Amino acid sequence: MVVGKVSEFIGSLYYLCVTLLRFKNIMKLKNYLLLLALLLVVGVRAQVPSGNKYPKREFRGAWIQAVNGQFRGIPTERLKQILISQLNSLQEAGINAIIFQVRPEADALYASQYEPWSRFLTGTQGQTPSPMWDPMQFMIEECQKRNMEFHAWINPYRVKTSLKNKLAPEHIYHQHPEWFVTYGDQLYFDPALPESREYICKIVTDIVSRYDVDAIHMDDYFYPYPVNGLDFPDNASFARYGGGFTNKADWRRSNVNVLIKKLHETIRGIKPWVKFGISPFGIYRNQKSDPLGSNTNGLQNYDDLYADVLLWAREGWIDYNIPQVYWEIGHKAADYETLVKWWATHSENRPLFIGQSVPKTVQFADPQNPSINQLPRKMALQRAYQTIGGSCQWYAAAVVENQGRYRDALISEYHKYPALVPVFDFMDDKAPDKVRKMKKVWTE
């Protein structure tokens, strides 16, 4: 639609120039008019989003979550078969990056040196898998076989999604209960405490040091989503650590900022090639809170979760951003098209990908063509902006299950050809050394 309007404008401009030249046969005027036309055409083209139907490089990710119980209590060999089947299906659908949840509740779906095995794996927190295996190491190896990136997904502050859940005796909570706060029916690390930040950095250090991950990934859970009628219980922490702040909201944002910066420095200090990515809630700020915000009316990263995502990107503390734009096109409070355009103009010079909800995409019809779902229009919007380098599918199982023929569409149309992941050249601008003195080695 936009390109069509621009073409009409250029045609009208050309007609005007030709008409004027008929009546003003002056060489100097002719040159001026042709130059003006050229400048206007170039200027307009620079403002128009230019899509690429089959990009050579594009982030095509998928989240594999543990918290929905899809792994819990499944025998080891059977679970390995399920994961291999999922990866094969996702590879066929053109997915080139897997974001795998390894730390849902200060626990582990890997052989952690500090935290207990996750109840989402074995059914009971602290219970060792039998026979013993390491899901993260297994997934890394399987992803590498398929030329997929592996992003280790951790939740930094969350400890209990329900106070009814039991923590293993070796859980850090039992050693330092003073580090934690209860909010609603959940338990969290207190983001204000230096001890909380140091501990989370220690966990990331362990993962990055011992595992060949391509990235550390965090989603939208920073300060918890607001519970109606309850303020987060951090008055004591504010009294102790809030010096220099008169506004508690600014102080809370600062607490998260410090963690994000420390995690960036931690990862860079161990393996500079490992990326650090964030997948925040889909609205940064509404216009009613900030004139620079989006024309939306919903919960906000900045004001409600105290996550200043644009600052993190601007300062170079994160290496990519995947806002969760899970709404449909035409949503009254959070329109997909409005948000994609907003994020595209606020990438802050960091790779930007769009988090897509598979169920929501296939559930709603295209407003301009009710006979089809919204996938074609969403993909066109995503690829229309040069600042958007791909997307990530929520959730992997929905793709594998081919909900609404989503996987079929990826294979036949949108991921018809494989794509390399985008280049993160700001992380390392040095080319690898030339290969020297290669030798043939025969193996049995």
Which stretches of residues belong to each language-model region?
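Aromatic- and acidic-residue-enriched segments that line the glycan-binding/catalytic groove
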Residues: A108-G123, R158-G184, D220-G243, D290-L299
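Active-site clefts of carbohydrate-active enzymes
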Residues: I64-A66, K275-N297, V325, L339-L375
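Pro/Thr/Ser/Gly-rich low-complexity, intrinsically disordered linker/stalk tracts
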Residues: H415-E444
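Active-site neighborhood of glycoside hydrolase catalytic domains
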Residues: K202-I203, R210, A215-M218, F222-G293, ...
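Catalytic domains of carbohydrate-active enzymes, especially glycoside hydrolases
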Residues: Q81-A108
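Active-site-adjacent "subsite" loops/lids of carbohydrate-active enzymes
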Residues: Q65, G69-E77, Y157-D206, R210, ...
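Substrate-binding cleft of secreted/luminal carbohydrate-active enzymes
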Residues: Y306-L310, R314-H331, R350-F426
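Aromatic-lined substrate-binding rim segments of carbohydrate-active enzymes
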Residues: F100, P104-I154, G244-I270
